[in-house]
Amino acid sequence: MQRSNPIKISDFNSDAYREAYSRINGLVVVGEGLADRHFRLLARSIPEDRDELERLAAMEGRHATDFVGCGRHLDIKPDVALARRLFAPLHQLFLDCDRAGDLTGCLVIQGLIVECFAVAAYRCYLPVADSY
């Protein structure tokens, strides 16, 4: 299996890069914040794993803060409004599952959908992460 090459961006200061990064940064910041809230709700639903889930929630919250800092380092403001609008249906679905006691639904949304998105989005940070 052939491995893909790392993303190559020659101009981190170009308008196109900054606009795209603003959107991705907003999605990652909001996504990490949602993960924090989701793990805290899961901690209520799974008391035997509460400590671990609260630890994961705190970690996600720190990630959100770190990604805000990464954007600030590049003088880019995250497009949080777009991210909130895009994540709203997924977050509402998580809340609906939580209210209905559908633990499996909550775990699928957080453990698969939100976390897989995060892993995919992190690839966009690789070219700038070392300098940050």
What annotation goes with each model-predicted range?
Residues M1-Y132:
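Non-heme di-metal
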